[in-house]
Amino acid sequence: MSQIDQSFGTPAIIIRPYSGTTGPGSIAANSNTEVNATSQPVDVNDQGWVMFYPGVTPANNVRPGTFRCTTAGTAIISWNNPTAGALTPTAPTATTPYLFVIVKSGL
């Protein structure tokens, strides 16, 4: 598993790539859409953000969704869309990966 571990004392910040090439699909306007993403590089009690590319102008704008993990390998992701219209993010690819920013305490 590829990862970058950067410790700033406690807690530690760990960045890992999202596994797979399926995005959240359409996110309704002014809402959070919660999904269970399986086969992800997360452990029980992990929490933090998922950075994703919304695929709107500007194309490289990155937005965060939050996640938590209660079962190893499954990220419960809340994809956030604060805009007035529905949002269909660009699916993750090798050049535009989604990234987990995991906050670990007690390391």
Predicted ranges, named:
Residues M1-V42, N80, T90-L107:
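Extracellular receptor-binding modules and their adjoining Ser/Thr/Gly/Asp/Asn-rich linkers
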Residues I15, A59-G65:
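Surface-exposed loop/edge segments in extracytoplasmic proteins
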Residues A37, G48-V50, F67, A75-I77, ...:
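Hydrophobic beta-strand residues in large extracellular and virion-surface proteins
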Residues D43-Q47:
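Extended extracellular/luminal ectodomain segments enriched in beta-structured repeat modules
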Residues M51-T57:
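A sequence-level detector for low-complexity, Ser/Thr- and acidic-rich stretches
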Residues R63-T96:
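Structured beta-strand segments within beta-sheet-rich domains
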